[in-house]
């Protein structure tokens, strides 16, 4: 696999759907993550990210336009001790509750499947960052229909230990626009994290997401030595 710039990867498609990036800053001192949402329908575009404790949740920007909250209102980011959970749906809570009961990330997700939004059957994507004793590792998961067949769910977990400085991985729900939307395939994309600046990275991601379809972006940098973090949120609706 060839390592690619996140700007190039994002700008090459009009609709990557929802996406999670996790990696390590260029100087190796920060664990970094980003989560973005995009939308094609009025209901999907009518959203903002808001802070919620140590994490975030989605909210309707205009409550009068909210049609079906089931798949669009959720907490994408929650923190459990030294673990930061990032997902594209309410499986954030499933992982949080499972790991709180000593299940692993992968075990917690066994009770979940792709989203029931036929004919897309949008994959559920999840990530977890673990920062402890000045060490950092992470994992990613995708739960997807069996090539569009909703009768079976394919589950993939990717775990990354000791990732070098300046590298990361990117997983997203869709390979591009279409009807139905084509689900992500293969391993998470190997991407460069060529900065130590949270604002520069936030800008790089936001500016390379399709202007019509992008909705919100969350970025967090966690100091691996201390566990302290800083975050950024950008909402198209404001």
List PLM regions with ranges:
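Conserved short alpha-helical segments that host acidic/polar catalytic motifs at enzyme active sites
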Residues: 1-238
